[in-house]
């Protein structure tokens, strides 16, 4: 079997282990991987298969390290996130190497998934763009509801920071999303409009 197809199967099998299920029975992690890959295809129409696989690894086995295992404050969140970047990147690299993917490609995926070189590495930037667009398109309302105790300004600051991480092309894509008015208002506020 082709190493890329073998890697895809191994990655998706890891996603299937996610105990969180959607109403249709699919794992939440597999659904997220599909959304990430779809955004990569939209943002980078000639994306190499290895970049598409990297997109599928964005939250690889994230479920295995619950946010609740770290302090609830900002420092705890940042520590958790940094740990996940490295863990997910290493797991992705291991699965790719087991599948026969060349070491150089597996190392690229490691860099992209671990967020190395954001703003300077096109692969890392593409994954960050896709992750933020998936968040805006699919997750922001549930995030707002889950954190109803946050003041509006905190959401605006989150959006401002996220916007600053987007490439110009991804910013344009974000502006084309059919977002709820409350989200659009917060984005406008974040952008000073």
What are these regions, as identified by a protein language model?
Residues 7, 51, 81-85, 126-129:
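Amphipathic alpha-helix face/heptad-repeat signature
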Residues 49-67, 72, 92, 111-117, ...:
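His-Asp-centered metal-binding catalytic motifs of divalent-metal-dependent phosphohydrolases/nucleases
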Residues 68-111:
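Helix-adjacent hinge/juxtasegments
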Residues 2, 16, 20-30, 34, ...:
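Divalent metal-dependent phosphate-bond-processing catalytic cores, especially two-metal-ion Mg2+/Mn2+ enzymes
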Residues 32, 47-56, 88, 105-109:
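Residue-level detector of well-ordered alpha-helical segments, enriched
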Residues 2-13:
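N-terminal, Lys/Arg- and Ser/Thr-rich interaction peptides
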